[in-house]
C-alpha cells in the first residue's frame, strides 16, 4: 500500500484541524481546540504552522450565486 509522504508529516491533530477548518472555516480557536482535543495555545500554533507550511492556503466564503443575481454558472471551452 502506498502512503502519501505528505501525510506522514502531519499527525492526527493536524489532520483533525484541517478537517474541522474545511467543514467550517469560521471556527474560533477556542471551538477548534475543543473539537480536536487540544488546548487553545497549541491549537493556534498548529494552525499557524499549517498556514506557513502551505497546507492552509486561505479562508473563503461560499456565496449564494442566486441571491446576488448570478444564477447560471457555465464553463465554456473553445
Sequence positions of predicted segments:
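A compositional/biophysical signature of low hydrophobicity enriched in polar/charged and small residues
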Residues: 1-78
Amino acid at each position: 500500500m502506498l502512503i502519501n509522504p505528505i501525510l506522514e508529516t502531519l499527525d492526527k491533530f493536524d489532520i483533525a484541524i484541517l478537517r474541522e477548518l474545511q467543514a467550517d472555516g469560521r471556527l474560533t480557536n477556542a471551538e477548534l481546540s475543543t473539537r480536536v482535543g487540544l488546548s487553545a495555545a497549541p491549537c493556534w500554533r498548529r494552525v499557524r504552522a499549517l498556514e506557513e507550511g502551505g497546507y492552509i492556503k486561505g479562508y473563503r466564503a461560499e456565496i449564494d450565486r442566486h441571491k446576488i443575481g448570478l444564477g447560471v454558472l457555465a464553463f465554456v471551452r473553445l
